[in-house]
Amino acid sequence: METVKIGDVDLCYEVFGEKNTQSIVLISGLGSQMIRWDIHFCNLLVEKGFKVICFDNRDSGSTVFNTKKEIPSDKGIEEVFAALSKEGIPYSLMDMANDVIGLLNHLKIEKAHIAGRSMGGIIAQLLGSYYPERVLSLTIIMSTSLNPALPKPDPEIMAMMTQPAADPSVDREGYFRAKIHFAEKISGSGYVFDLNQETTLLEEELTRSRTKNGIIRQLLAMGSFQYTPDMLKKITAPALIIHGTDDLIFHADCGKDIADSVSGSELMIMEGMGHSIPRELNDFISDKIYDLVK
């Protein structure tokens, strides 16, 4: 893994399949680190001829958003959220999209295929709309346009997402218990929840994390996003939309909304898939991406 300075961000990234000529950027979701893109999935894309670029979004994992305004560690998410909102939004989703462009510029990549999951799918939409000359194709997984008319997230899940997390340095067991419970809750009914995989990822995320509660600034970026249907209508790149029937964060109608708004896009509704990508779908999704671009 390497780090590059892009504006006020020290961005951590990793490239797989350096010698391949077709580049694909994988964009993670809210509070999610690049290691959530399963290494087997990355290797499958490499085998299909892709140079795979993974990175941590600002305020996630080993990527640091350099700011003098620290996030208080002794207050709940809602309290901090309210305080930061009054001071102004630290950055926008468009700033996060510009981080991707900065990374492509650093790597001297003129055009790339883009795949984003959850919030990363919104960033992918922004790239497809505002940087069409840089985007060869879009794969948008379990995401949303943030159209206010769409169904809201499950209330129980929203409560779990916004309640303060236990400090793992003080209550490691409580931290893991809550995180695992949440991950299992959103995983969907069609696939067996892999407890060992989730535990391993959580342990690695703790080791890699550089910013405590950085997710709050990402939430502010999402909360300040102004939906406009014109953004999706401007997308001209080939687009694949993948969404699960069991998604409790972004209802399946969110995926349908994107597909209805992006001309010529393909929609795949996956039975039993929740708001995560089970390993059982790695082959299928990598095949669909290859079919999209070949």
Show where each model-derived region lies:
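Conserved HGGG/HGGXW glycine-rich cap/lid loop of the alpha/beta-hydrolase fold
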Residues: 9-83
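Conserved acidic catalytic loop of the alpha/beta-hydrolase fold
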Residues: 82, 90, 94-112
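Conserved hydrolase catalytic core segment
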Residues: 110-150
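Flexible "cap/lid" loop of the alpha/beta hydrolase fold
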Residues: 138-169
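Conserved alpha/beta-hydrolase catalytic His-Asp/Glu region
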Residues: 173-216
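Short beta-strand/loop motif that positions the catalytic acidic residue
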Residues: 235, 241-243
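Catalytic active-site module of serine/aspartate enzymes centered on a nucleophile-bearing elbow/loop
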Residues: 265-294
